[in-house]
């Protein structure tokens, strides 16, 4: 199983990014793996406007943009997005 689809690895990533307390709520929202969390919002890391991320992820978790855990969620989302993109790239190269 790849890191993208591992629930255990997602939990570890939550811990590493300081948002382990949000893990149960992330799972309830259906975001139990990096692959699922990567597509929880239309936001693409690096774009100036992170409004979609704030609205679709942060606010849905009952947090506001100024919550200290928001930066951890951003890092987790970035990791999820880059892991999923790398996995897709790998699959395309082997097909």
Annotated model-derived regions:
Residues 1-29, 38-95:
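Sterile Alpha Motif
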Residues 26, 33-40:
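A short amphipathic alpha-helix within small helical-bundle interaction modules
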Residues 20, 32, 43-47:
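Short amphipathic alpha-helical interaction elements and helix-loop-helix interfaces
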